[in-house]
Amino acid sequence: MSIISETMKKWADENEIALDEVQLEKFEDYAKILVEWNEKINLTAITEPEEIAVKHFIDSLTVLKAFNIKKNASIIDVGTGAGFPSVPLKIVRDDIQLTMLDSLNKRINFLNQLCDELGIKAETIHSRAEDAGRNKPYLSLIHISEPTRRR
């Protein structure tokens, strides 16, 4: 088991969140794809496996503890960047109807490729938040932003 899987499994067990082998493999693949794309388009400063697991994946999953996300909820991640927190949430909660919005097309291209490779069903939108906010279908979606760290 790799450091990513070990770190994720330990956190999941401590927080009573079920993670199976398929989900752990998706996190492994996500980290690999993230690092590969990061060399081309600078998605993150965090590239060490354990840091990716803790600072990207686990931080994203803290949303599950902070919010009661109903089954089949529709979620839009505005300014999704490299897909945090939305893609880790979708890996753990496949029932979520996920939309990811970002203003940079290169990040949308990354997210489309990532979702294809991970077998994740999600919608991506290349738009600025203020423009998408004028579009009625998106007004009713839940907005979850990445938890911030206190320094």
Regions found by a protein language model. Give the residues of each.
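Class I SAM-dependent transferase core
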Residues: 3-70, 113-120
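Ser/Thr-centric signal marking residues that sit
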Residues: 44-47, 80, 99, 148
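Conserved SAM/SAH cofactor-binding pocket of Class I
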Residues: 61-139
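Single conserved hydrophobic/aromatic residue that forms the stacking wall/gate
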Residues: 142-151
